[in-house]
């Protein structure tokens, strides 16, 4: 998908039982980090299972622009010859990160403590998203940031020539902020420290340790504390990317709400910092089994077996929000097919994602007959065991909104359409063929 494609309307219709195996794509978070850490290592990193969605391809192109050799060997198989910590070259052109908030924020961190200048841009959706929450801590290292009003893209960073180590307490639970600070800390002398009120997804810490960085985590009175020793020589690693639990959520949800369904989703990451949706679904009474539990690339992995069955409404506590922040849109759909009220707490971060995801879901679900109440920090769905359907939903260039409404249409009484399914390619390029292969009617 190019960055300026024509809208691609799609419609999902009530479908028969979904059956078969759903091979979801590689994890997006780990794919970005594998390319970036490979570029910051000295030598050759071999990656398998890489997600080849537009977001990750944009990160691969950025690593090339900073001087790393990045080549695709085959499907999901890539090789990165890195330039080492502090070895990034100044890019010739502008770094276009497309739709990827993860990509742009991690890359800004990775270059902020190198004495080079880089300009970052993105699509219309990314250019509306707040970057100050990442650039503010990066400036503490000594880099200079020039941005549009509101600290939004396009944005130029002049990297620090003499970076200093930073001790930073994150103001919101965000793995992107934490990761940007840690990546910047790689090329600062001494120890860089990040303090979180509660732990967020920990792929960066796991992978930094795997690549040879000295990194420790501890829980103190201040919170969750991560300490990184600066200026390590990162050693290249083979990275086997597990399958993305956030992408798996869509076929899993479809199987839970379409009567008679039973599907298998192999090799999905069960990282506890990403597991909130599955914890919640089990509380709702979902029939999900985790088979063949194992570890791949430092991440716990399992095969999911999912069957349709009755579901009940639950309350999702705010402290679980960070471990399922990308899954609230699809959970709001599942909640419509449950009996009883589901309350999602602590969801304010969703208002600054690719779109205001709370508003987008609430408006679209109401248009399709659901009873939804939202506040700044909560979303409540009064489940009636089904959904009327019949409406067209605005996706606001947001891949997860588009996929959520298409899944809803597979079990609603009337078809559900989305105004633009094009953005799905950013995270899940094979969404349509995969869902159709299970028996979903989407056109």
From Swiss-Prot:
From the UniProt record, report the name of the gene that encodes this protein.
aroA
**What catalytic activity is recorded?**
3-phosphoshikimate + phosphoenolpyruvate = 5-O-(1-carboxyvinyl)-3-phosphoshikimate + phosphate
Q: Where does 3-phosphoshikimate bind?
A: 28-29, 33, 174, 176, 326, 353
Query: Which Gene Ontology molecular function entries are recorded, alphabetically?
Result: 3-phosphoshikimate 1-carboxyvinyltransferase activity
The name under which this protein is listed is 3-phosphoshikimate 1-carboxyvinyltransferase
Q: Which UniProt keywords apply?
A: Amino-acid biosynthesis, Aromatic amino acid biosynthesis, Cytoplasm, Transferase
Q: Which residues form the active site?
A: 326 (proton acceptor)
Lineage runs:
Bacteria, Pseudomonadati, Pseudomonadota, Alphaproteobacteria, Rhodobacterales
Q: What family does the database annotate? A: Belongs to the EPSP synthase family.
- Which species does the entry assign this protein to? Paracoccus denitrificans (strain Pd 1222)
The EC number on file is 2.5.1.19
Q: How does it assemble?
A: Monomer.
Q: Which GO terms describe its biological process?
A: amino acid biosynthetic process; aromatic amino acid family biosynthetic process; chorismate biosynthetic process
